[in-house]
């Protein structure tokens, strides 16, 4: 807390501001420091309107925010919270929310918007001007375009660019003249928004690199892990609620295959065993000479008679298909 002896040396508004910041810091379980240094006023207002219902954003002086964080850490006996000040940067602000850090990062990232590049700024990428009409009438702007290296000319009463031209490459400094031209052409190569400096949750501070994940890649890894775990459970015969049906089906199919191969007759395998024996009989008969066959066998061989239709294998096939579909069905429950 602010020492009472020194209160007369501190402006009252600063004391009030620190107290307000402390109240905000204690109000939510998720506290984030964000960088808003390069965000123009118009874009900032748009962002605030987008996130208003999900979080509280408060701007203040870094010195006051630092003091508020340190005092809250001391009052709550939470030294880890005090480490949040290490992530503070010029132009920082505080966000208080109940949104988990990953969702918070995604929400802030999606709230970013394109903006013109300022003179003196470093180009974030190659900035290319496409060939075509600018829609502007002949005038001083033609000279401005040529001054920044654009092949401009009058075409059908309008100023046009004759060919695609890269006016500045990634990493190069954008001149003030080029900044004016790009703005006039409506080109916004910069993405502005609130950048995460650090997010505190339950004793852990996450940085932007921790929170920035490829969702498709992450989901793919989860799906792969699920499928591997499913197959391990089935093959190692470790029943779970997700795999017990497949394990039983596999055991049934394996037992049935053994029964058929060993000619062990049961009510489930009799048809398959007889069908197999019949097929083997026809195959052997086909290798024998005509003198060794009766007329019935000769007729069956010449007509290509098939073994009796067996219903069980069809059922088995369906079961196998069901087994193959089981992992993806389980994934459907996850996502």
From Swiss-Prot:
Any Pfam family hit: Ribosomal_L10
HAMAP family reported in the protein's UniProt record: Ribosomal_uL10_arch (MF_00280)
Family of the protein in this entry: Belongs to the universal ribosomal protein uL10 family.
Endpoints of the signal sequence: none
Description of how the protein assembles with itself and partners: Part of the 50S ribosomal subunit. Forms part of the ribosomal stalk which helps the ribosome interact with GTP-bound translation factors. Forms a heptameric L10(L12)2(L12)2(L12)2 complex, where L10 forms an elongated spine to which the L12 dimers bind in a sequential fashion.
InterPro entries: Ribosomal_protein_uL10, Ribosomal_uL10, Ribosomal_uL10-like_insert, Ribosomal_uL10-like_insert_sf, Ribosomal_uL10-like_sf, Ribosomal_uL10_arc
GO molecular function, one term: structural constituent of ribosome
Compositionally biased residues, Basic and acidic residues: 315-325
UniProt name for this protein: Large ribosomal subunit protein uL10
Disulfide bond positions: none
Functional note: Forms part of the ribosomal stalk, playing a central role in the interaction of the ribosome with GTP-bound translation factors.
Gene3D superfamilies linked to this entry: 3.30.70.1730, 3.90.105.20, 6.10.140.760
Record GO biological process: cytoplasmic translation; ribosomal large subunit assembly
GO CC list: cytosolic large ribosomal subunit
UniProt keyword terms in alphabetical order: Ribonucleoprotein, Ribosomal protein, RNA-binding, rRNA-binding
Renumbered residue ranges of the record's region Disordered: 304-335
The keyword Nucleotide-binding belongs to this UniProt entry's keyword annotation: no
Gene: rpl10
């Amino acid at each position: 807390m602010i020492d009472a002896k020194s209160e007369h040396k501190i402006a009252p508004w600063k004391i009030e501001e620190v107290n307000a910041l402390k109240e905000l810091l204690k109000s939510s379980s998720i506290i984030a420091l964000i960088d808003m240094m390069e965000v123009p006023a118009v874009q900032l207002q748009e962002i605030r309107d987008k996130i208003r219902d999900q979080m509280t954003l408060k701007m203040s002086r870094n010195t006051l925010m630092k003091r508020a964080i340190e005092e809250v850490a001391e009052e709550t006996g939470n030294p880890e919270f005090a480490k949040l000040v290490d992530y503070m940067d010029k132009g920082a602000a505080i966000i208080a929310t109940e949104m988990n850090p990953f969702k918070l990062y995604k929400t802030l990232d999606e709230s970013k918007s394109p903006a013109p590049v300022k003179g003196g700024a470093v180009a974030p990428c190659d900035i290319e001007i496409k060939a075509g009409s600018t829609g502007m009438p002949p005038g001083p702007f033609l000279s401005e375009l040529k001054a920044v290296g654009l092949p401009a000319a009058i075409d059908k009463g309008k100023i046009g660019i004759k060919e695609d031209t890269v006016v500045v490459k990634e990493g190069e400094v954008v001149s003030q003249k080029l900044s004016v031209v790009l703005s006039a052409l409506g080109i916004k190569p910069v993405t502005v928004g609130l950048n995460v400096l650090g997010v505190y949750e339950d004793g852990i501070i996450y940085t932007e690199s921790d929170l920035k994940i490829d969702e498709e890649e992450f989901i793919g890894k989860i799906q792969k892990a699920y499928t591997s775990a499913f197959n391990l459970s089935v093959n190692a015969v470790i029943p779970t609620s997700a795999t017990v049906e497949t394990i039983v089906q596999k055991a049934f199919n394996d037992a049935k295959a053994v029964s058929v191969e060993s000619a062990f007759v049961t009510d489930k395998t009799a048809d398959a065993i007889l069908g197999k024996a019949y097929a083997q009989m026809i195959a052997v008969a086909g290798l024998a000479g005509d003198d060794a066959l009766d007329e019935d066998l000769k007729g069956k061989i010449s007509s290509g008679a098939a073994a009796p239709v067996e219903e069980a294998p069809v059922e088995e096939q369906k079961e196998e298909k069901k087994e193959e579909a089981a992992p993806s069905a389980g994934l459907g429950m996850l996502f």
